Amino acid sequence: MNRVKRAIIMAAGYGNRMLPITHTIPKPLIKVNGISMIETIIQALLKNEIEEIYIVVGYLKEQFKMLTKKYPMVSLIENPYFESCNNISSLYVAREHLEEAMILDGDQIIYNKDILSPNFHCSGYNCVWTEDYTEEWLLSAEGNRIVSCSRSGGSKGWQLYSISRWTREDGRKLKEQLELEFEIRRNRQIYWDDVPMF
């Protein structure tokens, strides 16, 4: 059994799907039922005793500083590429923290701490089987391996949630692959998920 020791929360993007609200506030800081989305994540991580928390910031980054005061275990990592690159750049700037890590998007609402359980068998994503049509990413798997991913959605597949866990070894491999794609191949318009999946 593997155990997550740290979390990387991706929060550098513009949140275009929530315009005009995100003109003045980053999407992860939008409050739902009186609490920001990202704080539901932080609190669930803390309840799971995951206390090494990194938030990758970019757009309106100064607004995240209050989180480091409220939660001293939170560290901010600035993504200087967020305006010109896809989210591969956010994981690239956090690549030193990928071993035994959980990676998740900051614009999720976590009410059940068990969703962020630190215990896991092998590296991979949180998914749920769906028979119904979804526009979310849909994975096909054989055993413990992802064999394909439809970004346009579909039905009868594993709907991807943006929560993944990585062993020490797989975290090292992911770091190497991120460096290869971002530095050498200069693939800067891809999703970070493209690196381990494709």
Label each region the model flagged.
Residues 1-23:
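N-terminal nucleotide-binding beta1-loop-alpha1 segment
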Residues 5, 51, 99:
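Short acidic/polar active-site loop segments enriched in Thr and Asp
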Residues 24-39:
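Short catalytic helix/loop segments, enriched in acidic residues and glycine
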Residues 35-52, 93:
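A short, N-terminal amphipathic alpha-helix
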Residues 60-62:
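A conserved acidic beta->alpha catalytic loop
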Residues 65-137, 141:
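Conserved beta-loop-beta/alpha segment of the NTase-like Rossmann-fold superfamily
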Residues 112-186:
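Conserved core of the sugar-phosphate nucleotidyltransferase
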Residues 183-198:
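Catalytic core and acceptor-binding pocket of nucleotide-sugar-dependent glycosyltransferases
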